[in-house]
Amino acid sequence: FDSESAIDPDFLERSGCDLERLMYIQATSVEFVLETIEELLGATDEQLVFIWDSLALTPAISDIEGDFNPQSSMAVKARILAKGMSKLTIPIADQQATFLVLNQLKTNIPSGPMARQIAMVTPYTTPGGKAMHYAYSLRIWLTGRKSKSSFVTDEKGFRIGSEVRCKLEKSRFGTAGRHCNFKI
């Protein structure tokens, strides 16, 4: 599910993806993504991998149909995700499917004295509220390193990647809090 229209078939093929077994779906709304996953899980016994890029940029239907006032659709996406994940968690597990959700960090903008204190402790928030935090079996925080020494270059000196810091925020499979650096 792609909400950014940024998929490159040539890159996928060079990366080893079998395009004959890939189903590309434009993520038009959060509801559409969740309903499509439910349909696909019910349509086959094959083991499936769902990748959603990205939760942050996929709007809810009320966001599309509503006005530009952010207050008018506050917490709608979080409520949809909470309901969707409670509905899909068991079918995903029963089919041994994988559901990978990419999300972005947003700056936590305080709107009152108490909120300012909270924002000092947690300066970032993720779109979709806490629903996904509870549903995730594994939550990984990736941050790019900025120094030139972290750049990956080819034989001509062109930058082709960079080093990434990875921190395990939550894990039902092992110990949370572990971290490592690797190159992409």
Where are these regions (language model features)?
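Phosphate-binding/switch region of NTP-binding enzymes
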Residues: 74-183
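Conserved inter-motif catalytic segment of the P-loop NTP-binding fold
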Residues: 1-83
